[in-house]
Amino acid sequence: SPDSAENVKCADEWVAAAPGTDGALAMSMGHVILKEFFVDQQVDFFTRYNQHYTDLPFLVALEPDTTDAGAADDGGGAAYRPGKYVVAGDLDIPESTSENAMWKPAVLDARTGDVAIPNGSIGFRYGEEGWGRWNLDLGDIDPLLTVHGTATGTARVVLPRFDALDGKVSHVSRGVPVRRLGGRLVTTVLDLMLAQYGVRREGMPGTWPTGYDDPSTPATPAWQEEITSVPAEQVVRLAREWAENAIDTGGRGMILMGAGTNHWFHSDQIYRAMLVLTSITGCQGRNGGGWAHYVGQEKIRPIMGFQHMAFALDWHRPPRHMNQTAYWYVNTSQYRYDTFTADDVDAGTGVFTGKGVMDLLAQSVRLGWTPSYPTFNRSSLVLADEADAAGMAPADYVVDQLTTGALRFAVEDPEAEENHPRILSLWRANLLGSSAKGNEYFLKHLLGTDNAVTAAQAPPDKRPTGIEWPDDVPEGKLDLLMTIDFRMTSSTLFSDVVLPAATWYEKHDINTTDMHPFVHSFNPAIAPPWQSKTDWEAWKAVAKRFSELAVDHLGTRRDVVAKPLWHDTPEAMATVHGVVRDWRTGEVEPVPGRTLPVLVVAERDYTAVFDKMTSIGPLMETVGMLTKGVPYDVDREVEILRHRNGVAHGGAGDGQPRLQTDIHVADAILHLSGTTNGHLATHGFKNVEKRTGTPLHDLAAEHEGKQITFADTQVAPVPVITSPEWSGSESGGRRYAPFTINIERLKPFHTLTGRQQFYLDHDWILGMGEALPVYRPPLNMTELFGETALGEQNALGVSVRYLTPHNKWSIHSEYQDNLFMLSLSRGGQSIWLSDVDAEKIGVRDNDWVEAVNRNGVVAARAIVSHRMPEGTVYMHHAQDRLIDVPLTETHGRRGGIHNSLTRIMMKPSHIIGGYAQLAYFFNYIGPTGNNRDEVTMIRRRSNQDVEY
């Protein structure tokens, strides 16, 4: 923890790393562990674990490096860079002609010295030849973790480093042992990892650290000390203790982190560096071990039933799922303020030359990697009719229109009026007072109201080249904003329509989280007061009126849905070797489901929305259910619900199970989820067994007859059942730990190799220099946006890192404005800063301060504390501006919220799709809403007698 927080009080040891430098700390620990437990000695427990469950033994081809970095030969011979995984289809071996051969990565077998293709990769997950072979059983194969000792030579590999203060790339070259296979130089992932982490072995050429005390090169303890301020000796000791504990306990070492890790621009690299520590030491898939991401109420244990009910998959498929970060980045015009190009975040490889991040998003959308709605610049409701008029199938018509340019993706012209969002409904989400990264841009471009944006738009040389860029940018795109909530927030104040909602104590509902292994119920203590309604009744009322209006306005229409290439489907094998080819440039043909989104026509009877909402649709019986690639036959469950809930009479849902009440819906979710229905859990595991060829269904068999009902949860919280919906086993009463099924039952991870992967070989990731974990510092906001350099002082105060952690005086994002919480804190918004920074700008505790950057302005009370590190301030999140927020000296208007000083920035690697584990699915993968890299000027207000 960078500050002396509550968790520090209870810790045996405090590691006070500077904000945003956790990746450097983790990499230096990895350096020590790799050297002492993989090179100086080999630990049988670590060796066996990594042979079975990680990609360390898998082969990677080296490619000639023709960049300037590769030309800078230091005497080590020709330069190479890490390339693609070696797969069966690359080699002259019997498996090269097998089904999905380009999706079956290879290893070297220590017994024979030859190439082997182990079971378990994604190539075995799909197709006829993979039945019974999608498992982690190595059989007679003994994978070599390293070719050192059996190598035919060495090769000099050029590796990027980003640890300069400005974040710019430089390079270091190091030798790796190699073998030649089919004309390729190959090495293993472990061999590349050792080079990346600066762990030298005998005979390896290149630039290497002289020891742990060498600060000149990445990953040594001394190197990280200059970045994190954590003493090198402490890191060495902790790394040894971590590895020794893993050996002694069989992998019971855990890294627990908060959501803040996810909020840095380079969050993926922080995570990957941490995951190295847990995975190479055999801690993943263990009770008491692994990687625990503390994110709160975001895991829906009965996910299967929830998804099918929430997204109306019982009536129509596919759904339109969207990632919010990209949606708001586009529709609040924040992309126009990117005063940098995508080149600024790559490794000098030229993979993004001349492109902005918005160009890459548009490419990702048109290749089917990530969703974008509205999809096209014409209504999806007219395209099928146009196709009929042209005598073409709708999918063929859309492809033809796209290739001729007559139809475009909306993301390629986002400021065109026909591509704007028009209606936004907020359901228990305080978007405009809490969660909107870049809040002032929302006010400016989405609502067209007062805002504090002073940022300059991108100059011509920094603008995207593949989208339309009108000089005049719209302000106020929405026509209607509706909010359903039980409390007053900024969002309700900005809304055109507010529908009052029942609280948790006035409705029936079910609740599960990733923090506990139970299903809970909410039960009303009183009926919803006055005009308020429960969620279900409120949306029923909206659906009923909508259906009535649709008789005259919409009727029945055919809708062309563009769906991205989904994870856990064969669509994740669309991009062979992760090589990016764009149909727009003629590199490949536009093929829906491979180089384009999947195009599906859905017939929608808009007059029947209410009928469909209040009954379970026929697709559950005619098609069944599918969750995480596992099919389920739920005819039995639907029939049970007919008897339990009754059936609808008349209308679209005639004869189908009713969903008239919130209890009906809760029971439907519980009956249609393996975690709450033992029959479905057992049935699902039996289906998985057909593909894996390994026993699994016994994990749920003890509960095959168990059905958790809503009435059960009203009596007491009920433990859930082990199910294919999740990766952990709770069989026999044990507590849930992720990936225990993968480790104990040899079920593959849902990745390219079927293992935990340290190496990523997609073109974009290789181009960014992130094939392996690498330290990438917080973004340099001075270089990118012209903000004052950290630590500098001027008339506006002092420049500091601006972080927005979870609030100390609220309950998550609510009740900050509760009288008890206000009394415990300062009565309104506050900013924590160190006594050192306070002295620099003449601030005393409880003074009014203003924080100002290009994104907005905040006016708040100062909390001066020695627990805060110099150079960093905290404004706890979800401090809405409803109470005790004065007018600012900066512009004379009301101060902002914690997200008024932030904005959305998207990392290109987060919008990759169509490639094994790097494939889209809702709430699984996508760009993060990062805001931790931000900086601000903070100063004492000259007038402490504030006005409201």
Segments from the language model and where they lie:
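Long, well-ordered, tryptophan-enriched scaffold segments
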Residues: 8-248
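Phosphate/diphosphate-binding loops
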Residues: 478-480, 486-487, 524-547, 850
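Short, well-ordered beta-strand core segments
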Residues: 14-16, 424, 481, 498-500
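Flexible glycine/proline-rich, aromatic-decorated loop/lid segments
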Residues: 6, 495-522
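Flexible loop/turn segments at secondary-structure boundaries
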Residues: 4-8, 22-23, 234, 245, ...
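Long, contiguous, secondary-structure-rich segments that constitute the structural scaffold
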Residues: 392, 537-601, 612, 622, ...
